[in-house]
Amino acid sequence: MRAGHALVLFSGGQDSTTCLAWALTQFAHVETIGFDYGQRHHVELQARQTVLAAIRSRFAQWRERLGADHMIDLSVLGRISDTALTRDSAIQLSAAGLPNTFVPGRNLLFFNLAAAVGYRRGLHTLVGGMCETDFSGYPDCRDDSLKALQVAVSLGLGQRFTFETPLMWLDKAATWELARSLGGQALVELIVRDSHTCYHGVRGVLHAWGHGCGTCPACVLRQTGYDRWQARPVAAP
């Protein structure tokens, strides 16, 4: 068990749910923070509450460690962004070579605001589900970006903050395996049934890997990782 308390950037998706479970195994007290930034679908905001309630009810070993949840109104980001996550537009590559699901400044703002909350509540470890292995090239998911931001936040607030990114060098198959190692099949089932990833907000169809349209980049990445994880040989006991 590590010293100190942690604040998890928690969206209700697969990655942030896995990171929340990771934090609950590492720290004696963990709080969560989410952001309403004007995303097209509020399904993920509903999934946040479902996942948090499920963790409290199904995982006795984590129940007492899971503290307050903080929801931040960041709707201004949606108003100034013109992306497929904040507008009703088709997903495609932009002229810069990035998918138009990239919301400029999103993770930078998330960490800055999380640090402001953490400063007030004595939560100096911030945990995020960013990843360089299976990702869409978002510059604010890169390890270098987050390390630079960690330094800037620590200097700007006059306190030492640590940004933890447990998934940074894992592919999606390894993320599924990490979830299993943290919470067993119960956590895998929670992620499948209760977390949300689909860019189109589809919840009516439950696949082996979870709810979703099955065709958007987020669903394809999640399904591919799940299939690869399932195809891996089981280690001998």
Curated annotation (Swiss-Prot):
Gene3D superfamilies in alphabetical order: HUPs (3.40.50.620)
Keywords, ordered alphabetically: ATP-binding, Ligase, Metal-binding, Nucleotide-binding, Queuosine biosynthesis, Zinc
Cofactor: how and how many bound: Binds 1 zinc ion per subunit.
GO MF annotation terms: ATP binding; ligase activity, forming carbon-nitrogen bonds; zinc ion binding
Chain sites annotated for binding Zn(2+): 198, 213, 216, 219
Signal peptide coordinates: none
Residues bound to ATP: 10-20
Catalytic activity: 7-carboxy-7-deazaguanine + NH4(+) + ATP = 7-cyano-7-deazaguanine + ADP + phosphate + H2O + H(+)
CDD domains: QueC-like
Cofactors, names only: Zn(2+)
Entry's EC annotation: 6.3.4.20
Single GO biological process annotation from the record: queuosine biosynthetic process
Similarity comment text for this entry: Belongs to the QueC family.
Function: Catalyzes the ATP-dependent conversion of 7-carboxy-7-deazaguanine (CDG) to 7-cyano-7-deazaguanine (preQ(0)).
Protein name: 7-cyano-7-deazaguanine synthase
Species of provenance: Verminephrobacter eiseniae (strain EF01-2)
Lineage start: Bacteria, Pseudomonadati, Pseudomonadota, Betaproteobacteria, Burkholderiales
Gene: queC
